Amino acid sequence: MTIETVSENKAFGGVQGVYRHVSAATGTTMTFSVFVPDHAPGATLPVLWYLSGLTCTHANVTEKGDYRAACAEHGIVFVAPDTSPRGEGVPDDEAYDFGQGAGFYVDATEQPWAGHFRMRSYIEEELPALIAAEFPVDMARQGITGHSMGGHGALTVGLRNPGRFRSISAFAPIVAPSRAPWGEKALGGYLGADRAAWRPYDACALIEDGARVGELLVDQGDADQFLTEQLRPELLREACGAAGIDLTLRMQPGYDHSYYFISTFMADHVGWHAARLG
């Protein structure tokens, strides 16, 4: 695998880069960003994955996420992939919550999406192999986080791969997409009408079906316009309570769904992951 450098800029003593490569999983060119803090020659660093939300690319968190100072302080590599395949020949939908920019971190089985929308394979298999080959990372020390649709991605990828991730957190995640309009539309469109096929992509369903991790951290603004209909954090609290998973769910007064919220608590999440990644 080879990558092309789109840009590299010095930041907080390290390098913030944007890169692209041809993906076998999606059959498209994919773009992602990586922040590598300053480090000793030959050292390998823990890595924190960040999965973005609906309509986003890698650029949203890269430009507005305010993670670099904390990652530089703690010596953590920060990786931000795109949210879907893009480009000529890639199917799309006019709605903001389906198609390009709304991959939901699934491997689609329905047409016309199945040919390119293989974000689960991309995030779980292809991109980690590329990052391990090209950057100074210690793949035995991985954490994952994300926002909204990406919070759903972080929770489900983490729950499906408990041996890979030492730490899992989320900002305003869609915790039970099978019981939320965004999720029902996306999972039905990408995976078909059989709801059994949706369960590996639903954090609460995964926990109900036996997935276990030691702990989870979730921050949620109580002024989030999507709180009651789409996000429903109380369902995750119920699922974790029944399963004995240590969930820290922090309802943050007055915060909405935006990057103003994410950037406020990003350094805290990076520090929380750092304490678990060593």
Language model features: what each stretch is:
Residues 1-278:
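Non-catalytic cap/lid and distal C-terminal segments of serine-dependent acyl enzymes
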